[in-house]
Amino acid sequence: MFKFKKKIIGFILPVLVLCLLTACGKKKEKYIGDINENTITINEDGSIREIACENFSDTNFDISGLKDDIKSDIDKYCGSDKKGAVKLLEYKEEDKNVRVAIDYKSLDDYNAFNGTSYMNSQDLLAFGDVALRDMAGNDIYVSGIDTSVAAYKIFSADAAFTLNISGEIVYYNGHVNINSSNSARFDGLGNAVIIYK
């Protein structure tokens, strides 16, 4: 009987030590990573992930309570009828640089929480007959796009940030710099517009 207990302990003890050394269990996911500029991601289901980056080194702004302020604003917004509409995922503070990852259930929640009026629509003419370029650099107006080819969406914003989408950018205007087929940089100098599928 003693040998049997010794064998069990001899087996279980190393497994427990191994679990402790390798941090057995769920590791906390890193959302921000090395992102250091404002980034918005539109997921396939229409939800939004924002990485907001701000440098407060040139201001006298006291950032010591900023995380609590953000949590409080989220709690106020969500209340009882919008439970889970906005979630703080990660908060990083290094020197006077603050980076925050926040999830939003929809663009409507993003706009309401942030006081913005970004638009994402299947109505391509929602912004008028805007002049755009295709990915080859050819000029086209929205009215000239053949909507029978694909289910397009149009996104517009007037701020500087990187936009990532679950899809493929097909057309864009002069306030957009293309990073890849699913990522673009909005310059913040005017109303940036992309059409994607």
Name each region found by the language model.
Residues 20-23:
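C-terminal motif of bacterial Sec signal peptides marking the signal peptidase cleavage site
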Residues 25-27:
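Bacterial signal peptide processing site
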Residues 92-197:
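Mature, soluble, non-transmembrane domains
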